[in-house]
C-alpha cells in the first residue's frame, strides 16, 4: 500500500518476494534515502491507508472468540495509525532508528526470527498458538503452531508448502481458526 501511495514501485518488494529480511530492509532504506523520504513523510502516507476490506470485522469477530496477537515485522512508528483503525489490537513489532532530522538510519529487530521466537515463547508459558500469514517470514511460526494457515499468500509459497491450508477470504480463515480452537 505504501508503494502505491508513494508512487515508488520498487517498494512493492516484500517478504513475500525476498525471504532475507535484513537484505530487504537495507534495500528499502536505500530506496527511501534515494527519494528523500523520512519518517514524517512515511507516517503521513501511512495515515491515509485504510485496512484491507473486512480486516477490522475479521479481527473483531476473532477477538470475541479468542485472544489475538499480531506479530509483525513492521515498525512501531508505522503501525500506530493502522492499529487505531483496527481497534488497537495487540501488536508485537520492531523499531526504527531515526535521526533528529527524521531520516531513518536503521532498524532494531525485537529479536532474531521474531515471529517464530514469539510463538515459541508463548508456547513455553503454556499457550497454544494458531498462526496465519502470507510471507516467507511467517512460515516458521505457522509450522511451529498447533495449527497454521496461509492467507492471501503468493502462488509460489502455496506451491512450495502444499501441506499448509491456504485461504483467500477472511470468513474461510475464521472458520479454520475456529475449528482449530
What are these regions (language model features)?
Residues 64-66, 122-128, 180:
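Glycine-rich phosphate-binding loop signature in dinucleotide/nucleotide-binding domains
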Amino acid at each position: 500500500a505504501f508503494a502505491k501511495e508513494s508512487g515508488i514501485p520498487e517498494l512493492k518488494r516484500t517478504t513475500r518476494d525476498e525471504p532475507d529480511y535484513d537484505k530487504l530492509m537495507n534495500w528499502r532504506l536505500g530506496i527511501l534515502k534515494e527519494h528523500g523520504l523520512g519518517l514524517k513523510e512515511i507516517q503521513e502516507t501511512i495515515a491515509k491507508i485504510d485496512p484491507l476490506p473486512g480486516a477490522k470485522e475479521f479481527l473483531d469477530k476473532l477477538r470475541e472468540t479468542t485472544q489475538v496477537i499480531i506479530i509483525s515485522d513492521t515498525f512501531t512508528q508505522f503501525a500506530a495509525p493502522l492499529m487505531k483503525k483496527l481497534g488497537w489490537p495487540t501488536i508485537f513489532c520492531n523499531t526504527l532508528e531515526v535521526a533528529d532530522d527524521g531520516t531513518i538510519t536503521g532498524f532494531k529487530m525485537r529479536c532474531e526470527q521474531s515471529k517464530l521466537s514469539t510463538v515459541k515463547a508463548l508456547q513455553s508459558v503454556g499457550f497454544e498458538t494458531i498462526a496465519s500469514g502470507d510471507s516467507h517470514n511467517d512460515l516458521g511460526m505457522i509450522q511451529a503452531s498447533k495449527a497454521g494457515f496461509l492467507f492471501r499468500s503468493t502462488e509460489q509459497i502455496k506451491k512450495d508448502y502444499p501441506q499448509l491450508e491456504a485461504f483467500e477470504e477472511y470468513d474461510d480463515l475464521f472458520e479454520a481458526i475456529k475449528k482449530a480452537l
